[in-house]
Swiss-Prot record:
Keywords carried by this UniProt record: Chaperone, Cytoplasm, Ribosome biogenesis, rRNA processing
Recorded domain comment: The PRC barrel domain binds ribosomal protein uS19.
Quaternary structure and interacting proteins, as annotated: Binds ribosomal protein uS19.
Function: An accessory protein needed during the final step in the assembly of 30S ribosomal subunit, possibly for assembly of the head region. Essential for efficient processing of 16S rRNA. May be needed both before and after RbfA during the maturation of 16S rRNA. It has affinity for free ribosomal 30S subunits but not for 70S ribosomes.
GO CC field: cytoplasm; ribosome
NCBIfam families linked to this entry: 16S_RimM (TIGR02273)
Listed name of the protein: Ribosome maturation factor RimM
Domain PRC barrel: 111-184
Composition bias, Polar residues: 1-17
Main location: cytoplasm
GO biological process: ribosomal small subunit biogenesis; rRNA processing
SUPFAM superfamilies: PRC-barrel domain, Translation proteins
Length: 187
């Protein structure tokens, strides 16, 4: 990682200027490749060469150069190669870092579409009620995305982000509707 300054349009200390798109979860092989767990539905962020930023917990983002990337067959993980990371030890030192892009680089979406990360912070409501039961606190990407919802009771539950369970998302109004099967919110 180099300490090259961030783009002038992004404040390295403001989380609002950055969009987390993945996490480095492990070294791959002996030549410095890294496994990346994506938090983005745009694979070009992991396969097209160019500038990205890495952020270790409690640190400012640091600029890195993505040289190449590929998706592992049959998995949601990517393998990426970063400039200056040439061996397993230097790759292992980056495990746990969050991969960022400037928030201004979000792809344009069609009307009615939204970025999954925009769901964090929305109120969760049950069908037939205007009262919130909790707030979306995190998004867990995988085969099926999961919403982590902190209930008003203080308990945290994971809810599959599928249309049958989350049939309505109202970003502008700040809420989403849940129609969970019996017992899901009690797990």
């Amino acid at each position: 990682m180099t300490s090259t300054p961030s783009p002038s349009t992004a404040d390295p200390n403001s989380t609002n200027d950055w969009l987390p798109v993945g996490t480095l979860v492990g070294a791959q092989g002996l030549k410095g490749e890294l496994r990346l767990n994506p938090a983005s539905d745009f694979p070009e962020r992991f396969t097209e060469p160019g500038t990205r930023w890495l952020q270790a917990k409690g640190s400012a983002p640091k600029e890195v150069e993505l040289l190449e990337g590929r998706q592992l067959p049959g998995k949601s993980l990517y393998v990426v190669r970063l400039k200056g990371v040439n061996n397993r030890a230097s790759a292992e030192a980056l495990v746990g870092c969050t991969v960022l892009v400037p928030a201004k680089d979000r792809p344009e979406l069609a009307e009615g579409e939204f970025h999954l990360l925009d769901l964090v912070g929305l109120e969760a409501r049950l069908a037939g009620s205007d009262e919130p039961i909790g707030t979306v606190s995190n998004l867990i990407s995988g085969g099926n995305d999961l919403l982590e919802i902190k209930l008003n009771s203080g308990k945290t539950v994971l809810v599959p982000f599928v249309e049958a369970i989350v049939p309505d998302v109202q970003l502008e109004e700040g809420w989403l509707l849940l129609t969970p099967p019996p017992g899901l919110l009690e797990l």
